[in-house]
Amino acid sequence: MAAAAAAAGDSDSWDADAFSVEDPVRKVGGGGTAGGDRWEGEDEDEDVKDNWDDDDDEKKEEAEVKPEVKISEKKKIAEKIKEKERQQKKRQEEIKKRLEEPEEPKVLTPEEQLADKLRLKKLQEESDLELAKETFGVNNAVYGIDAMNPSSRDDFTEFGKLLKDKITQYEKSLYYASFLEVLVRDVCISLEIDDLKKITNSLTVLCSEKQKQEKQSKAKKKKKGVVPGGGLKATMKDDLADYGGYDGGYVQDYEDFM
């Protein structure tokens, strides 16, 4: 009986050993905690994937924002153009108002009134021209004298040289002197009396110098015409005397022959 009981006990232990199943998760991961860490790692992978989706969404949002920036820049440019047009119109209205109802803070001479009207008219024409250029998109690229906008003394000196070269190329024309007379009068009409006196004095000095040069040139021509010994008339008289003496000798010889 004892031997049978021992054999039965060994059989039970063998069955227990044969059918015992180890947890593969514990065998590989080293326990329940390790197995749990493994699944948590897989969850983290899913989180990374979610972050990639977030990055894609952010890129899409940035791409959608860029056109909005461009639109806002266009709006700013359009607003600037409108503001400039408003200022231009306001300036035109002020000029028109001054032309229709000129203010007279002081008593002006007829010349000064004419100069003021001409100046305002010129401003209005320039304003209209600029507005037309902006409306039709005309290119304002200019060169030479038209490109200059003198503000300093050196700028005006250079501007004067270019202007002189432009005008003096027509000095051989029959209408050049009358053209300058009208031009000088028109450009000086808005000047003050003191400035006009300076210009007048400068022209007076120039006129005196030209008169001296003319007198000197006439004196040189007279000296060239003078001949020693009585001049041209004396020379002609001597020639006639010689001719007469020759005639007299010829007649005398003819009479002796007869």
Curated annotation (Swiss-Prot):
Pfam families: eIF3_subunit (PF08597). Component of the eukaryotic translation initiation factor 3 (eIF-3) complex, which is composed of 13 subunits: EIF3A, EIF3B, EIF3C, EIF3D, EIF3E, EIF3F, EIF3G, EIF3H, EIF3I, EIF3J, EIF3K, EIF3L and EIF3M. The eIF-3 complex appears to include 3 stable modules: module A is composed of EIF3A, EIF3B, EIF3G and EIF3I; module B is composed of EIF3F, EIF3H, and EIF3M; and module C is composed of EIF3C, EIF3D, EIF3E, EIF3K and EIF3L. EIF3C of module C binds EIF3B of module A and EIF3H of module B, thereby linking the three modules. EIF3J is a labile subunit that binds to the eIF-3 complex via EIF3B. Residues 1-108, 217-238 are annotated as: Disordered. Gene3D superfamilies: Eukaryotic translation initiation factor 3 like domains. Residues 70-135 form a coiled coil. Residues 60-106 have a biased composition (Basic and acidic residues). GO terms for biological process: formation of cytoplasmic translation initiation complex; translational initiation. This is Eukaryotic translation initiation factor 3 subunit J. Residues 40-59 have a biased composition (Acidic residues). GO terms for cellular component: cytosol; eukaryotic 43S preinitiation complex; eukaryotic 48S preinitiation complex; eukaryotic translation initiation factor 3 complex. It comes from Homo sapiens (Human). Residues 2-69 are annotated as: Sufficient for interaction with EIF3B. Residues 1-11 have a biased composition (Low complexity). The modification Phosphoserine is found at S11, S13, S20, S127. There is a cross-link at K106 (Glycyl lysine isopeptide (Lys-Gly) (interchain with G-Cter in SUMO2)). Component of the eukaryotic translation initiation factor 3 (eIF-3) complex, which is required for several steps in the initiation of protein synthesis. The eIF-3 complex associates with the 40S ribosome and facilitates the recruitment of eIF-1, eIF-1A, eIF-2:GTP:methionyl-tRNAi and eIF-5 to form the 43S pre-initiation complex (43S PIC). The eIF-3 complex stimulates mRNA recruitment to the 43S PIC and scanning of the mRNA for AUG recognition. Residues 243-258 are annotated as: Promotes stable association with the 40S ribosome.
